Curated annotation (Swiss-Prot):
Binding-site positions, GTP: F129, S263, G264, V265
A single MF term (Gene Ontology): ATP binding
Protein encoded by which gene: YchF1
Native organism: Arabidopsis thaliana (Mouse-ear cress)
Pfam families: MMR_HSR1 (PF01926), YchF-GTPase_C (PF06071)
Protein name: Obg-like ATPase 1
GO CC annotation, single: plasmodesma
Phylogenetic placement of the source organism: Eukaryota, Viridiplantae, Streptophyta, Embryophyta, Tracheophyta
Cofactors that this protein relies on: Mg(2+)
Length: 394
């Protein structure tokens, strides 16, 4: 008997992502005191929060939502001229500076670490500039040492957390024969050994079942990281800095996460200028703001994407977790949409832009109906059909 043909739409199976499965995810700005965290936050959000030259001046995490710059959204708004325009946003938390020994409560360590546990990703800000007027908690500027300090503190806190979980599970096993406890214990022991070997959880080759358990722990070293390298304006302009090669080498050796050089001084100066003046200044100095890239990279790092709904009343970005299926995406609009999901009518932004309008997309056969198993892609334009008891279709 010949083998059964594979289903045509069976694509590669993606393994689950580390982290919470939610559309309400946030990223935290983390680093040592006086590296430029609050300056970055102030510039991103244009909020007036303290950024004085004093360790621990940020005690409670400040929160803000920053719009995601997107030419696709701008084009849709220009095309549909809607009454309402709602872009995607990145929720950013400014978290006070960590110091060596934070996992043992040094400085304000326990508070800060709990704030980091509450976010879904990390903007790790590194100071790569020297300035006698801005103190460094370790006196000498050394970004690689700072990298090791922060990553070690997060890892040590994870080791402490996992150790306590192992104790709890072992106690539970004395009272229960639940097989799941044994599975959890074996994973915890494996994770503890991994951490004690100096490796972050996010770089482990975990099985699907492992990831489902790990996601209940919210481990600090499991969170995605984007390294933001704070330079002085001169180094940023000439794209050279004596610390950058060493930072790059360290990052490549430790997982190869994204690095983005920026200049807090330059960004703050731009933010204080009128738009025309800022554009002229950038053109004259052959510079551009790093903020759009920082925002987009942070949004992607925490595994968020968005789809569009578009019409004359409203153009809106709907944020969902990467790997979300059509019914889950529908639920981002309203729970009834998910509960009574019938299908998703989908067109790609690129097709709409190329062909000019919805009827042309349909005529070209590029307007598709997708069912419950469809995995929504970033930039999809979707119209959902649903039916619930006592309701109608949309």
């Amino acid at each position: 008997m010949p083998p059964k043909a594979k289903a045509k739409d069976a694509g590669p199976v993606e393994r689950p992502i580390l982290g919470r499965f939610s559309s309400h995810l946030k990223i935290g700005i983390v680093g040592l005191p006086n590296v430029g965290k609050s300056t970055l936050f102030n510039t991103l959000t244009k909020l007036s929060i303290p950024a004085e030259n004093f360790p621990f001046c940020t005690i409670e995490p400040n929160e803000a939502r920053v719009n995601i710059p997107d030419e696709r959204f701008d084009w849709l708004c220009q095309t549909y001229k809607p009454k309402s325009e709602i872009p995607a946003f990145l929720e950013i938390h400014d978290i006070a500076g960590l110091v060596r020994g934070a996992h043992e409560g040094q400085g304000l360590g326990n508070n800060f670490l709990s704030h980091i546990r509450a976010v879904d990703g990390i903007f790790h800000v590194l100071r790569a500039f020297e300035d006698a007027d801005i103190i460094h908690v370790d006196d000498i500027v050394d970004p690689v040492r700072d990298l090791e300090t922060i990553t070690e503190e997060l890892r040590l806190k994870d080791i402490e957390f996992v150790g306590k979980k192992i104790d709890d599970v072992e106690k539970s096993m004395k009272r229960s024969n639940d097989k799941q406890l044994k599975i959890e214990l074996e994973l915890l022991q494996k994770v503890k050994a991994w951490l004690e070997d100096g490796k972050d959880v996010r770089f482990g080759d975990w099985k699907t079942a492992d990831i489902e358990i790990l996601n209940t722990f919210q481990l600090l070293s499991a969170k995605p990281v984007v390294y933001l390298i704070n330079l002085n304006e001169r180094d940023y302009q000439r794209k050279k800095n004596k610390f950058l090669p060493k930072i790059h080498a360290w990052v490549q050796e430790h997982g190869g996460d994204t690095m983005i050089p920026f200049s807090g001084v330059f960004e703050r100066s731009l933010a204080d200028m009128a738009p025309d003046e800022a554009a002229k200044y950038c053109e004259e100095n052959k510079l551009q703001s790093a903020l759009p890239r920082i925002i987009k990279t942070g949004f992607s790092a925490i595994n968020l994407i968005y789809f569009f709904t578009a019409g004359p009343d409203e153009v809106k970005c709907w944020q969902i977790r990467r790997q979300s299926k059509a019914p889950q995406a529908a639920g981002a609009i309203h729970t009834d949409f998910e509960r009574g999901f019938i299908c998703a009518e989908v067109m790609k932004f690129e097709d709409l832009k190329e062909l000019g309008n919805e009827p042309a997309v349909k005529a070209a056969g590029k307007y598709r109906q997708e069912g419950k198993t469809y995995v929504v892609q970033d930039g999809d334009i979707i119209f959902f059909k649903f039916n619930v008891s006592g309701g109608g279709k949309k």
